[in-house]
Amino acid sequence: MAITRRGLAASGLLLGGPRPARARTQWRAASAWPVANPMAQLLRRFCEEVDEASGGAVQIQWHGGGDLLKSRDIRQALQQGAVQIGDISLAAHSQGNPLLELDTVPMLARTPDEARRLAAVTRAAIEQQLQREGLTLLYWAPWSGAGLFSRFAIDSVGSLRGTRMRSMTPVGARVAGLAGATVAQVEPEDVPRAFATRQASVMLASAITGVDSEAWQFASYFTTLSSSFSKNAVCAQSRAMDALPAPRRALLREVAGRCEAAGWDGLQAAQAAAQQVLSGHGMTLNPPSPKLVEDFERIGTIILGEWIERAGAPGQRLLDAYREG
């Protein structure tokens, strides 16, 4: 029987025997959120599942609690290759891009189902934007609904006039301005100090953020407004992702899909758990009054109109698709 080159290759005898095993991939992943935070834990799960599913061929060292990078630094570190995977707040680091701010517009998506539909409608456009910045979206996950942390009961936007409202997003800053509050730009890890030094007196944030910052130390009330459900994006540096062999890229995407589904499916449980922690530490959880809802709807309408002006026709098409959904 003739011995062919193809047969030699198949048997591993060509060029002196079998090819050496492909080199192990070793990456680093950074999250600024506290170790017990659901976002940080989801990224940890991603890293562990990738290691297990790849049989150790892809190892991603997880860094949580901001021990490697602060939230403000992760995006740039990703782009420069200091880390290969990072957990970033889209709205906080939008750099003026309206597309990345849409999920923080007040009263546009007030339930987990609405937030999930908005995410689905905007995903392709956001992926393209991130690619232009050298980032590849692996998965994203939502925060629980945004509410108001304060030392006093809030019945209307009038209650916010003259306060110092903590914000870390452009939309949040605009909300503060329209409510008659002074904006206090404060990163997540600096929230307790900002309240202790009176740099901030009110915060529009999720119950999960309240747990992270131990809001019971500086607030007595959490008004469960659910004005928006913002998202975090876990991204890979595109150059590092593209350099992976195709099977490894596929594996990362497969695990990312499972983590994204877990983030959405676990949202209501995470929100309930966070609210229970706040209540357990003596905070009063109040539903929003009809007047407060009306006031925030008015603010949301103004901000959405401004958003459409900046986003133009492409943004309007996304909004139409969301509303028709």
Stretches with model-predicted labels:
Residues 114-121:
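A gly/proline- and charged-residue-enriched helix-loop-helix capping module
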